[in-house]
Design a protein with these regions (language model features):
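Residue-level "edge-of-site" marker
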Residues: 9, 35, 72, 110, ...
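Hydrophobic faces of well-ordered beta-strands that scaffold small-molecule active sites
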Residues: 3-7, 28-32, 66-71, 105-107, ...
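Short polar catalytic/cofactor-binding loops
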Residues: 7-14
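Catalytic domains of carbohydrate-active enzymes, especially glycoside hydrolases
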Residues: 16-36, 100-101
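Glycoside hydrolase catalytic-domain groove-lining segments
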Residues: 185-190
Length: 190
């Protein structure tokens, strides 16, 4: 069994220290979100191939597997500029993953909490973004994943199944946190 952690739960750490900290805590694998994980990275625009290589080398040295490279973007946003930036950033992370070797690059499909009408409006934009990203993942031969969240256009497992059927790609995976598809996850489910 591997013990994994979200690296940003440890706060932002120096690139040369994070993997060692995880190892000292008994962590074997990680979900890594670059701007949330490292003091040297304020945004994806600051990430260079040299930084990616430093991260890879430090995690490899400590024996920590990067299972998920998180790149949480607003993939369904109807604003063309916002969505283009989101897709371009996710594509960068797909390319970074060739070096980092994470199992998947993952994202939710929106930032804000959307009502049912907004989810319907955002849905075709989300589909367009996912199609572009699947094409890039296939080109690079890496895997990507989307995560259903009740408040987002990818709101439930039925919608996820429809997306997977439409995309029909072995490079598209799913991150599933059951609490994220509940309208009120704080309610006792017993």
């Amino acid at each position: 069994m591997l013990v994994a952690a979200r690296t940003h739960d440890y706060g932002k750490q120096p690139i040369d220290s994070l993997a060692g900290l995880l190892k000292s805590e008994g962590i074997d694998a990680a979900q890594l979100v670059l701007p949330k994980g490292f003091t040297e990275i304020g945004s994806y625009d600051e990430v260079t191939p040299e930084i990616i290589e430093r991260i890879r080398a430090n995690f490899e040295k400590e024996g920590i597997k990067i299972h998920i490279l998180g790149c949480y973007m607003d993939l369904g946003n109807p604003d063309d500029d916002v969505r283009k930036q989101a897709v371009d950033t996710f594509k960068k992370c797909l390319a970074f993953n060739k070096t980092l070797g994470a199992s998947i690059v993952g994202s939710e499909t929106a930032y804000p909490r959307l009502n049912d009408e907004e989810k319907k409006i955002w849905h075709p934009y989300m589909m367009d973004s996912i199609a572009r990203l699947v094409e890039e993942a296939e080109r690079l031969d890496v895997d990507m994943a989307v995560e259903p969240v009740y408040w987002h256009p990818l709101k439930d497992l039925e919608t996820a199944a429809m997306v997977f059927e439409k995309m029909n790609s072995s490079h598209l995976k799913m991150i599933f946190d059951p609490a994220n598809v509940l309208e009120h996850p704080e309610i006792d489910q017993d």
